Amino acid sequence: MSASNYATERETAEGKVFTVTGGDWDVVVSGTDPINDERIVVNMGPQHPSTHGVLRLVLELEGETVREARSVVGYLHTGIEKNLEFRNWVQGSTFVTRMDYLAPLFNETAYALAVEKLLGIEEQITERATTIRVLMMELNRISSHLVWVATTAMELGAINMMLYGFREREYILEIFELITGLRMNHAYVRPGGVAQDVPDEAIAKIRDFLKLMPKKLEEYEKMLSGQPIWLERTQNVGVLDATGCLALGVTGPVLRSAGLAWDLRKTMPYCGYETYEFDVPTHTDGDVWGRYLVRLAEIRESLKLVEQAVDRLRPGPVMVADRKIAWPAQLAIGVDGMGNSLEHVAKIMGQSMESLIHHFKLVTEGFRVPPGQVYVALEAPRGELGVHAVSDGGTRPYRVHYREPSFVNLQALPAMAEGGLIADVIAGGASLDPVMGGCDR
C-alpha cells in the first residue's frame, strides 16, 4: 500500500515533507480485537453414533454456538416408490412396509386405504378387518414411541432407559410375529383387508401386555421425569412454537407439544377411529421436554385404543368377498405347509381348470384398478403420513408418492438448532424422531 494512504505530502523549501497521520492505526487496533466472525464447519454424521450412518448434519459453529445447520439426506435411498410402478397392487404392500421400518403397519394401511379408495370398495371392508387394522396400528405406535424414548435417552446418557424400552418393545414384536409371521416388514395389511386372521393366543398375549405396560410407564417416569440431568438436557432445548410448526408443515407429537391438538384420528377420522374413545395429548412448551411428555401420554392413549379394539373383535371374514380382488384368506394350514386347505388345493389342482387359471392370474398379474388418483392420510407415530396414488387402469400403480413425516419434520431442524449449543443438536434432532428409511425411501 502506498505511503499516501498513511501520510500527507507537501513541498517545502527544504524539499518534500511527509506528515504521518496514523491512518493505519485503526486497522492495527481492530486486528487485535477478539475475532467474532470466525466460524468452523463441522460435519456431524453420517459416521456419527447419533446419526446411525444415514444422516449428515453440516453445522457452522461460532465457539459452541450453532449459527447455521443443514441436514443432508439420501444415504438410505432405496427407490421404493419407483419400484412400485413395476409390481402389481398387492405386491406393493411388501415394498411400502420397508420405508419407515419402525412403523411398517402404518405404511401398509395408508397404501391399502388408497388402493381401496381407487377401487371404490371402502364400504366393503369387513368390520373385523378394520378393527384388526386399528389394533395393529396402535400396537405399532406404542413400539415406535418405545424406540424413541429408549434411543433418545441413550443419546443423552441414560443407558438404562434404552434397555428397558427395548425390553417392552420386544413383547410387542413377539405379538406381531405371532399374528403376521414376521417381527418387522409384515406386508400384513393388504388392499381389501388383512392377510390372515388374529389367532386366539395372540389375543391372550395382548391382554397380558395391557396389564404390564402401564406399570412400565410409571417406571420410565420415575427414571426420567424427575431426573435433574434429563430436565437440563430437554427443557427449553430445541424450541419450535406452533407458528413455526405450521410454517414448516411439521405434524405429529412435535406439533402437539407446541399446543395444537391436531391428530388425524380426530380431525379426519379413518378406520372407524371416530367410534373410539381417546384423548389427544398436548403440551405448550414446544421443546424436547414437551415432546417427551406427549409421546408418553400417547402410549397411554394407544393402550386404551388397543383394549377397545380387542373387546370389539367379533368373528367374521378379514378380507372382502370379491374374489376378483381377494387372495384366498382364512385357509387352514394344509399338508403342503403353504396355508392352503385340502379342499382348496383339490379344487384348483384337480377339479376346476377355471379356478386354477383365476388363481394363477390373480397372483401373477393382479387385479385392475380403475383410472384415477387419490390422496389418503393417517396419523403415524411421527405425524401425517399421506399417500398419493395414481392409476392408469392397469394392474400396476402409475405412481405412488408418500408424504413422509420424517422428511418434512427434518426440515425444522435448522430452526430448532440455530442459536443453540452444539451439545443440544442431538437432543433437538432426536426429538423430531426421524426415521431415514421413510425420509429417503
UniProtKB/Swiss-Prot annotation:
Look up the EC number in the record and give it: 7.1.1.-
- Record's bilayer topology term: Peripheral membrane protein
Q: Got a GO cellular component term for this one?
A: plasma membrane
GO: which molecular function terms? NAD binding; NADH:ubiquinone reductase (non-electrogenic) activity; quinone binding
Q: Is-annotated flag, keyword Transit peptide?
A: no
SUPFAM superfamilies attached to this UniProt entry: HydB/Nqo4-like
Q: Which UniProt keywords apply?
A: Cell membrane, Membrane, NAD, Quinone, Translocase, Transport
Pfam families given for it?
Complex1_49kDa (PF00346)
Q: Which reaction does it catalyse?
A: a quinone + NADH + 5 H(+)(in) = a quinol + NAD(+) + 4 H(+)(out)
Q: Where in the cell is it found?
A: Cell membrane
Q: What is its main location?
A: membrane
Family stated for the protein in its record: Belongs to the complex I 49 kDa subunit family.
Report the function annotation for this chain.
NDH-1 shuttles electrons from NADH, via FMN and iron-sulfur (Fe-S) centers, to quinones in the respiratory chain. The immediate electron acceptor for the enzyme in this species is believed to be a menaquinone. Couples the redox reaction to proton translocation (for every two electrons transferred, four hydrogen ions are translocated across the cytoplasmic membrane), and thus conserves the redox energy in a proton gradient.
- Subunit relationships: NDH-1 is composed of 14 different subunits. Subunits NuoB, C, D, E, F, and G constitute the peripheral sector of the complex.
The cross-references to PANTHER family, in alphabetical order and at most eight, read: NADH DEHYDROGENASE [UBIQUINONE] IRON-SULFUR PROTEIN 2, MITOCHONDRIAL, NADH-UBIQUINONE OXIDOREDUCTASE 49 KDA SUBUNIT
* HAMAP family, A to Z: NDH1_NuoD (MF_01358)
The protein's name: NADH-quinone oxidoreductase subunit D 1
Classification of source organism: Bacteria, Bacillati, Actinomycetota, Actinomycetes, Micromonosporales
The UniProt gene name for this protein comes to nuoD1
